Amino acid sequence: SLKNVPNLRNISCIISVPLLNEIWLGSEYYPEIYRVKKEKDRIELLGTLNLSNYADNPGFPRIFYEDSKHNLWVATTKGILVKPEKEKNLQDTKFPSMDITGIGEGKDGTLWIGTRKQGVYNAIVSSNLTFEKKGLKNLTTQTDKLVSDNIGAICIDDNGLMWMGSQDGDVFTYDPRTKKVE
């Protein structure tokens, strides 16, 4: 039983990883991801990814997101790691340390990253899956008329419209084509 795994008492995030035929579980208070799969009538622990092996001060996993190219993004309390589609290991993206609340992919392949108190970032992903400062655009209440900088969740709909829910009770959209907030 997984109840005997001490660091799995509180799970912060979970995702299916079909290419590996496994499920990933993020530990709330440890820099670890647990890899599991269901075998007949029991859940089997396949192994642990210690995030400290991939980044200095990696933080704890909070959000898993798979993009259209099957790269698996792991937002932590300290930044973002990624598992490239054809790789086994995670790598550090060099995203600045901030409180990340959501990740979504735009129609153009850029990533949208919601944050608590710092608005939303639009990130051009380099070929080696890192973020460079020149490829990061920060949208805020001051610069882009967002309704709130305190973003709780984001998603991108089929038309490319970004939806945001704030931790102040607001729901609003941003259209990357027209740069309009509604």
PLM features per residue range, with description:
Residues S1-E182:
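Carboxylate-rich, polar loop motifs that coordinate divalent cations or form catalytic acidic clusters
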